[in-house]
Amino acid sequence: MPESGFRTWNGVESFEFVDGVRLHAIGGDQVLLCRVHYEPGKQVPRHAHEHTEQLMAVVEGSVRMTIGDETRELRPGDVVCVNKGIEHELHSENGVTFFEALAPVPLDHVPDKERDLVLAEGGATHVER
């Protein structure tokens, strides 16, 4: 890891997490920060991160999110925490952009599951295992 803690989104390519959902990811030793964008009408089905806690903050648009049995419509300024192992799903009718922080880093948020996320000057890069 570089000595400096400063990072930039510039030059960090997004990748398609699922159809119509793109991530820009920058990681540290124990946490991953993603800028996430859903195209209108897109969703991520019910799932859980068994070993990862997730914080999300909506910055543009809206998303309907279900955590366990509770569903809410999230808009800019709304923040949500999903604890380890809790099932959740998201659907955005009109599109949404949010930031999410995940710790520890889940490999399903890394562009190539057969590679590890490492840091380089100017952003995140990947190396084969």
Feature locations, PLM:
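Histidine-centered metal-chelating micro-motifs
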Residues: 43-45, 80, 84-89
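A short, N-terminal "cap"/entry segment at the start of jelly-roll beta-barrel domains
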Residues: 1-30, 113-129
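Glycine- and acidic-residue-biased ligand/ion/polar-headgroup-sensing regions
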Residues: 51-63
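Short acidic-glycine-tyrosine-enriched beta hairpin
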Residues: 69-84
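Short strand-coil-strand connectors
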Residues: 29, 66-70
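A short glycine-rich, His/Asp/Glu-containing loop-to-beta-strand
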Residues: 10-46, 52, 101
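A cytosolic small-molecule/anion-sensing beta-strand core signal
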Residues: 59-60, 75, 94
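Ligand-binding loop in jelly-roll beta-barrel domains
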Residues: 84-108
